[in-house]
Amino acid sequence: MAAKVEPFWIRKTLDQLDHEEWESLCDGCGLCCLQKLEDEEDNSVYYTRIACKLLDLKTCQCSDYPNRMKFVPDCIQLTPGQAEEFKWLPPTCGYRLVSEGKDLPLWHHLVCGDRDAVHHERISQSGRMLAEGSVPEDDWEDHLIFRAG
């Protein structure tokens, strides 16, 4: 009987992942690309349903991922060295889960093989987001959806 091989996200740390493994941890939910507000008193991070100008509101994918930093200078670029700071990511995020030594959820494409499961399970905000330019920044508090961190 062959020994069971643990998936890479169980047997490796974030620092040990190659580029392809790292990128594959992203479940495609797009939540990290939503505009966020930070409570200055307790540093809590609140997610809004307002999407970055490059985020496709249906697919939850960046419309110009390779060049995103040029068009959105404050775009978040996750790296393994930031793992200690991943508490602000959604609790369902593969990067956060692996950094905390947890397994990926059953709906994650690396587990179930279906990249659309994140939408079918309503983890993503597909179809429920607002375009960044459609909401004045002063009104973002009216569109909070959850707290992380």
Swiss-Prot record:
HAMAP family: UPF0260. This is UPF0260 protein Pfl01_1392. It comes from Pseudomonas fluorescens (strain Pf0-1). Belongs to the UPF0260 family.
